[in-house]
Swiss-Prot record:
This is Protein sel-1 homolog 2. The chain crosses the membrane at residues 663-683. GO terms for biological process: ERAD pathway. Coiled coil: none annotated. Residues 684-688 are cytoplasmic. Sel1-like repeats lie at residues 107-142, 143-178, 179-214, 215-250, 297-333, 334-370, 371-406, 407-442, 443-478, 551-586, 588-623. Residues 19-662 are extracellular. The keyword Repeat applies. GO terms for cellular component: cilium; endoplasmic reticulum membrane; nuclear speck.
């Protein structure tokens, strides 16, 4: 970015923030004094040395664990290494003076070794080994390794969260021009975690971070400009930020498909997280293995797929994937044959890249009419892998696979018409196939749809229509892996580590992370924020999630205004949010709450008939609402009946008894008492 343009952008940001005087006054009230003890660089180095020392014992005690347990306890693993008594003295001034060339080269080498391990494997054991190299490289003054270690301290990797130490490292790194550190400081400022709550400062940090090349900062700014968070809402600016990240993600996806990450909602089943469908329970996994060994072909293929891409909480394991696919292929599974072809086409440790073997298995699958096999043959002819480039053959196989509904084939058909590869360019056909593939979530199809809308290629240009799919592609970045580590941290009771990971993802615009962060804050179990901040921050996050279409979050906003959590009691505003959730999202809970407010005239005019109707609608919408609705209607009809009897001989002028206000608050106790009396009566008759 041009320095002058950057300066102008910062001045605009400062101007916008000064105009929002009310917001600034609120921010000043929300600021808290940073009482955390400042950690010297030497103490940070001592902490890194401690990490380095702790892993040595773990390297010796290499106990066998199941993949799900390793994944679950990944944040408790310790880093391997050795102890050096002169560590602190030698390195405490590495920020002040440049390290010797030999030390710098060694630090770079160690960082590259660690980074290679980190990128090439999803195994937690190997990730732990990577951090051994990062620790040693950081000790030698390698800035990139220090960034890795600062992240580990911030997010609580290996069970050693120390936000104060992380901030100290980030501040030193930011002075050295680290865009990752600037992004982290912006994030911490935006929540007031370990630092003053300062949205204006956060925005400046993000601006510098994005100028330096931080994809996270780009994404955060894109979300802020899209939603108008502390900046003037501007779709074009949001589009510009999101496109940069989407281009980066699309380039990665063209080289490999990427790994989808399960985004577990803590709000759906908080009392029984282990049974969440997004994560495979260990007992169920063992049962599936048993069935696979007994010859269940469908289970063999399913386990092969899970291990191939590392889904449902399982580590990516190419050897196990190939093992199950070979067993299923031997039994005649066309899907298994196609996946084996895919493994050999892409190449990995278990199946080295081999076009001839890939062609063999794709052909076997295609002969059975398998869509994945047909698409695989199309890829070989399109790219000329093991066979001469032949766009005609590629088109034929892509069409056959697309007719069977395979989204990757639909995308490649669209791409051929979009780029004019072997066919005349036809943007209408390209749009058609991109759209079909996007309905199944094909990420590159979504990206090219966004490209067409952003540039007006073959369609009418629309910023809003383009920015949403760009945002969806951006959310496929490697940073989404924090969803799993945050989930397992929460499940294991490490609430602070879980919250800070969800909070970062929430800042980047992930709706699920916004809901999960608000849910954790609402529980008041976290210690990294003051209790007085939790409800206001939770309300802010519920609101952001609701704007993105979360019905549960919309009901929560109504609840906060109804009870006065993090804001003043406001029945009228509560009723407004319940109405939105009921009308737009058909939420049974919102219908029930709104019915209660109509029944009692809270924030809206009393309307008994509308209350009855909403109670009935709640029962029809959700079976879970039947019993609450039954009791609510029983109470409503009882009160109405008693009022009719007692007021029968009185004119309106002499209505002195207000049963609803007198008995209303205790109606649930009265109903329970009535039920108890009826049960006693029935039991007595039964014994007679």
């Amino acid at each position: 970015m041009n320095p002058l343009a950057l300066l102008v952008e910062i001045l605009i940001i400062i101007e916008v923030t000064t105009k929002n005087s009310e917001a600034e006054r609120y921010n000043r009230k929300q600021k808290e004094v940073n009482v955390t003890t400042q950690v010297s660089v030497s103490k940070v180095k001592q902490f890194l040395s401690h990490l380095l020392e702790q892993g040595k014992a773990n390297k010796i005690a290499n106990k066998r664990e199941n993949p799900l347990e390793k994944k679950k306890h990944q944040h408790k693993l310790k880093i391997k290494g050795i102890q050096n008594k002169n560590l602190l003295k030698r390195n405490q001034n590495y920020f002040k003076k440049p390290a010797k060339k030999s030390i710098t080269d060694k630090g770079d080498e160690l960082f590259k070794m660690g980074n290679k391990i980190l990128q090439e494997s999803k195994s937690q054991k190997q990730k732990t080994e990577a951090y051994t190299f990062f620790t040693r490289a950081a000790d030698m003054g390698n800035l990139k390794a220090m960034e890795k270690m600062a992240d580990a301290l911030l997010f609580g990797s290996f069970g050693m969260q120390n936000i104060t130490a992380a901030i100290q490292l980030y501040e030193s790194l930011a002075k050295e021009g680290s865009y990752k550190a600037q992004n982290a400081l912006g994030f911490l400022s935006s929540y007031g975690i370990g630092m003053e709550y300062d949205q204006a400062k956060a925005l400046i940090y993000y601006t510098f971070g994005s100028a330096g090349g931080s994809m996270m900062s780009q994404m955060i700014l894109g979300y802020r400009y899209l939603s108008g968070i502390n900046v003037l809402q501007n779709c074009e600016v949001a589009l510009n930020h999101y496109k940069k990240v989407a281009d980066y993600i699309a380039d990665k996806l063209e080289k490999s498909e990427g790994i989808p990450v399960e985004k577990v909602r803590l709000t759906e089943r908080p009392e029984n997280l282990s049974s969440n469908s997004e994560i495979l329970d260990w007992d169920i996994y063992q049962y599936y293995k048993f069935l696979a060994e007994r010859g269940d072909v469908q289970i063999q293929v399913s386990l092969g797929q899970l291990h191939l891409i590392g889904r449902k909480g399982l580590d990516q394991d190419y050897s196990k994937a190939l093992y199950y696919f070979l067993k299923a292929a031997k039994a005649g599974s066309a899907n298994a044959m196609a996946f084996i072809g895919k493994m050999y086409l892409e190449g990995n440790a278990a199946a080295p890249q081999n076009n001839a073997t890939a062609f063999k298995y794709f052909s076997m699958a295609a002969s059975k009419g398998n869509a994945i096999g047909l698409h695989g043959l199309g890829l070989l002819y399109f790219h000329g892998k093991g066979v001469p480039v032949n766009y005609g053959e590629a088109l034929k196989y892509f069409q056959k696979a697309a007719e069977k509904g395979w989204p990757n084939a639909q995308f490649h058909l669209g791409f051929m018409y979009y780029s004019g590869s072997g066919v005349w360019k036809d943007y209408k056909l390209a749009f058609k196939y991109f759209y079909l593939a996007s309905q199944s979530g094909q990420p590159l199809a979504i990206y090219y749809l966004a490209e067409m809308y952003a540039t007006g290629t073959g369609v009418l240009r629309s910023c809003r229509t383009a920015v949403e799919p760009y945002k969806g592609v951006c959310e496929l970045g490697h940073w989404a892996e924090k969803f799993l580590t945050a989930y397992f941290a929460y499940k294991d009771g490490d609430v602070d580590s879980s919250l800070i990971q969800y909070a970062l993802l929430a800042e980047m615009g992930y709706e699920v992370a916004q809901s999960n962060s608000a849910f954790i804050l609402e529980s008041k179990k976290a210690k990294i924020l003051g209790k007085e901040k939790m409800y206001p921050m939770a309300l802010l996050l519920w609101n952001r999630a609701a704007i993105q279409g979360n019905a549960f979050a919309r009901v929560k906003i109504g609840d906060y205004h109804y009870y006065g959590y993090g804001t003043k009691k406001d029945y009228e505003t509560a009723a407004t949010h319940y109405s939105i959730a009921a009308d737009k999202h058909h939420s049974a809970q919102a219908m029930f709450n709104l019915a209660y407010m109509y029944e009692h005239g809270l924030g809206i005019a009393q309307d008994i008939h509308l209350a009855r109707r909403l109670y009935d609608m709640a029962a029809q919408t959700s079976p879970d609402a039947h019993i609450p609705v039954f009791f609510a209607l029983m109470k409503l009809e009882t009160m109405h009946f008693l009022q009719d009897i007692l007021f029968f001989n009185f004119t309106t002028k002499w209505k002195w008894l207000k049963l609803d206000s007198t008995i209303g608050p205790y109606w649930d106790l009265l109903v329970i008492g009535l039920i108890v009396v009826v049960l006693i009566f029935l039991l007595r008759n039964h014994h007679r």
